[in-house]
Amino acid sequence: MPSIVVVGANWGDEGKGRIVDFLAENASASIRFQGGNNAGHTVVNDFGTFKLHQLPSGIFNPDCIAVLGPGMVISPSALSEEIAEVKAAGVNVKLCISDRATLCLPLHALEDTLEELRLGDAAYGSTRQGISPAYGDRVMKKGILVGWLNQPDVLLERIQFMLDWKMPQLKALYPSCDFSQTAEEMTQWLLDVTAPWRAFICNVTEPLKALQKQNANLLFEAQLGAGRDLVYGEYPYTTSSNVTAAYAGIGSGLPALRPERVVAVAKSFSSSVGTGTLVTAMEEQDNFRESANEYGAVTGRPRDMGYFDAVATRNGVELQAATEIALTKIDCLSGMKDLKICVAYDGDHSENPIWPQTAALSPVYENMQPWDEDITGCRTFDSLPIAAQQYVERIEALMGVPITMVSVGPEREQMIIR
């Protein structure tokens, strides 16, 4: 297990945190390489139940260093709260936080919110955490680097530089913008709120390269899924970073990374939160959503529910260059009477559609045999009902990539290894 990258094959919420927590038992470092406080990875283990937003899911392994890579945008107060939460549960926190990561400030969250309000019905469905504005500032060379927290004079200078550029634009575009903090006030707030983790700031490339030389096990964790990738997702209803395995090296501080394994995590049905097209959307979603507990980990918004979309998932698996698949939440399908898989799209532009072409597509379904048994206690593939085995095998055939893990519940031990 020298290098494993865990990524999403769908639109996020596939259960990556659960898979990373399972794999982290043998990892020397668990690395987040993109995103920020805009999505949550739910982890259930001996410490409790956690919805991690910025900390890597391997934080619970006492022998594992948790790394926040340079490709991230870090919300400072939220990270402090997250660290306090896991510490309170008895976790020994071992962190390395990249000095090249970008800070996601309350001003960015305000800008994000004002833009969603301005867009009205055309809004992107943002979590309003400030992710897009923070990445935008980075691209415009106005971002605030994490490393400047240890250089207060530089921090103050760069915040003033950003405000001089940003505030006239915000006040012109959003008349209701009432942000009034000075650069001095923002600097002091940042120094206060980051006190719990400033000592962990470093050039993360050095410890990671040292671990590579030792042939240590490195575990890379993506946020969201291929369908939300900035380049290959359903633009403009995407996130603002690259969520593919190809970005793991760049975003983690190891640009020359060549991972041995890429695990694409796919849910056994489709779900999506935010704006965009879910081709396989169910007509009646409420009961299934409730039983599967499908609500956004950050916003609590109900996720749109659909049947397994083999077309979108295969596209995600290919984009991720996956060597294997982890299939999650198959236990939620027990008792479903109408079980089917979308094997193709019908309509114009059915091959590699870009929005809004996706909205005109209709699914071509293949009916599957349902099962009623409770499978949460199954620990081997052969112990699953025949219909459940056939469901997994059919998805595997459609993907062209082996399904090596099947989860039948949220607990660590509820994992079937094939």
UniProtKB/Swiss-Prot annotation:
Mg(2+) binds at residues 13, 40. GO terms for biological process: 'de novo' AMP biosynthetic process; IMP metabolic process. Homodimer. InterPro entries: Adenylosuccinate_synth_dom1, Adenylosuccinate_synth_dom2, Adenylosuccinate_synth_dom3, Adenylosuccinate_synthetase, P-loop_NTPase. Its EC number is 6.3.4.4. The gene is purA2. GTP binds at residues 12-18, 40-42, 303, 329-331, 407-409. Substrate binds at residues 297-303. Belongs to the adenylosuccinate synthetase family. The keyword Acetylation does not apply. GO terms for molecular function: adenylosuccinate synthase activity; GTP binding; magnesium ion binding. Keywords: Cytoplasm, GTP-binding, Ligase, Magnesium, Metal-binding, Nucleotide-binding, Purine biosynthesis. GO terms for cellular component: cytoplasm. It catalyses: IMP + L-aspartate + GTP = N(6)-(1,2-dicarboxyethyl)-AMP + GDP + phosphate + 2 H(+). The keyword Glycosyltransferase does not apply. This is Adenylosuccinate synthetase 2. The active site is at residues 13, 41.
